[in-house]
Amino acid sequence: MIESHDAVGAATMNAPSAPCVVPVPRFGAATDVGRLRSVNEDGYLATAPAFIVVDGMGGHAAGRSATRAALGALGSLTSTRVTDVDTVVDTVRAAAAAVTAIPSHALYRPGATVAGVVLADLAEGPTW
């Protein structure tokens, strides 16, 4: 998930308030090492219901490790039906803990910036 590649797909979810309307988000994702770096420290999840970008920080190895650790924790959002906000918050906290737990003897500690959306099936209807 960290090397340059593309992901394209579609997802569906039931819309209880309007049985004839089913949201079908279309999505794509890609990452690229760019011109300045030799190692890609970025990654993403693009599997419904989670669409998340992670930007690793802390130098080549540290940034890459941080991205992998964060994506490892956040990956649980792709295998479940999200029915409450706490599930997302707890998963992001687990990702932060996974990054913090990475040992580092370098000048810069590993870190990661996480941004994304999760399609949640709340009692009042689907929401991002």
Placement of each model-derived feature along the sequence:
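PP2C/PPM-type serine/threonine phosphatase catalytic domain
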Residues: M1-W128
